[in-house]
Amino acid sequence: MAITAAQVKELRERTGSGMMECKKALVETGGDIETAIEWMRKQGLAKADKKAGRVAAEGIIVTAVSQDGRKAAMVEVNSETDFVAKNEDFRQFAEDVAHQALISNPATLEDLTSLPLGKGRESVDERRHALVAKIGENLNVRRFTLVEAENGCIGRYVHGDRIGVLVAVEGGEEALAKDLAMHIAASKPQAIAPKDIPVEILDKERAIQIAQAKDSGKPPEIIEKMVQGRLQKFLSEITLLGQPFVKDPDIKVEKLLKDAGANVYRFARFEVGEGIEKKVENFAEEVRSQAQGD
């Protein structure tokens, strides 16, 4: 029978094991989750399996960049505790994974975790599993991204190993690209320009603003103007071009780029543990404070 991605995901969540291990277990057991767990235990995966119930919400963000500075990879690798996130073996593993992503161009996370790491035949996921057994915590290669700048450069910024940004910039100086990466780390834009915001997000915000404006009791034509104004403000807050530049709030990023003769055509921002239920420190505010010299 064909093994689905949903089955692999469920088995990963229940065992904490890697994609390839879970897929193999499901193939061996005809796709039955419970039997697959038992099979994995029989294959000597029990030690790692015992770590599966713990949430790996700490970790680090690591980047790797090509020699010509026009291509970069960024990886988030999670651990259970901040203490392990500072472990040298853990860091080396994360750096090796980022380098492998950079040189191999994997299309998916499953592709990345099945790649060989270093000169040996051990895969990324096999190395991860060995580290779980050695360190004694659940570890997870959570996500990665690749960013290329064919006609420009890559700006990158990592704050305290917990926030990472890659931004592809055409025109301007490398210093500008780095400043933009720092800005994105602090200001968390959702897209470059208003046209890049998904329609469903705009529709949801519009509905919220209409509901709020109706409570004012004003005429429909006034309500429409109020809604449009609030939507414009919303878009300026969540798009890179509309945001005040973090190092000089008197100028917007759009004007900063125009004055420098530069364009941003892609960026990626990772923050450790995004979407994982845990206590979150406000590292974005810390970046903003540092950038503004507070």
From Swiss-Prot:
UniProt region (Involved in Mg(2+) ion dislocation from EF-Tu), positions on chain: 81-84
Gene3D superfamilies registered for this protein in UniProt? 1.10.286.20, DNA helicase RuvA subunit, C-terminal domain, Elongation factor Ts, dimerisation domain
What CDD domains does this protein's entry cite? UBA_EF-Ts
Q: Which SUPFAM superfamilies match?
A: Elongation factor Ts (EF-Ts), dimerisation domain, UBA-like
Keyword Protein biosynthesis (UniProt): yes
Major location category of this protein: cytoplasm
Task: List the subcellular locations.
Answer: Cytoplasm
Q: Which UniProt keywords apply?
A: Cytoplasm, Elongation factor, Protein biosynthesis
Question: Does the record's keyword annotation contain rRNA processing?
Answer: no
PROSITE patterns for this protein: EF_TS_1 (PS01126), EF_TS_2 (PS01127)
Q: What does this protein do?
A: Associates with the EF-Tu.GDP complex and induces the exchange of GDP to GTP. It remains bound to the aminoacyl-tRNA.EF-Tu.GTP complex up to the GTP hydrolysis stage on the ribosome.
**Protein family per UniProt:** Belongs to the EF-Ts family.
**Identification of the protein by name:** Elongation factor Ts
Q: Give the originating organism.
A: Nitrosococcus oceani (strain ATCC 19707 / BCRC 17464 / JCM 30415 / NCIMB 11848 / C-107)
